Swiss-Prot record:
Protein name: Protein Ac75
Subcellular locations according to the entry: Virion; Host cytoplasm; Host nucleus
One BP annotation, GO: exit of virus from host cell nucleus by nuclear egress
Oligomer status and interactors: Interacts with protein Ac76.
Species this protein is from: Autographa californica nuclear polyhedrosis virus (AcMNPV)
GO cellular component, one term: host cell cytoplasm
InterPro entries: AcMNPV_Ac75
Main function: Plays a role in nuclear egress of nucleocapsids and intranuclear microvesicle formation.
Keyword Ligase carried by entry: no
Annotated keywords: Host cytoplasm, Host nucleus, Virion
Amino acid sequence: MSNLMKNFFTELVKSTTFTTKVSVVKTTLSNWLCEQVYPDKDFSLKLKRVVNMFLNNEIENNKIYKLVETVDSSNKLSRRQVDFLIHALLNNVSVTFTLHRFVDDNVLTQDELSFLANFLVTKMDEAYQLPAY
């Protein structure tokens, strides 16, 4: 098989994998919001407060590390990778705009969920490629 064909199939597999990841993240996020966040007004309010605090840099990184350690029981993310993700989230105007819409009591659209899923998968892939030191 020629190098051109090998490269084509390699890129096809990467794209399919990426597309699948985005689809899974979007579906999971949508289900979580619709089934657990939006219906539960108390939880929704608390989550929106935390997201707002995050957007306003009111949460210390050490607290974010502890939260990630709790959620990421296999410890796949180093603090450096978490810092990368924090920076990526807070420095993307479209992400912060979308999160502010959520905080302001708006139901996120399917387009917004697609955008967030694409962004999260891209940045997680980039974070996993960083050296863990």
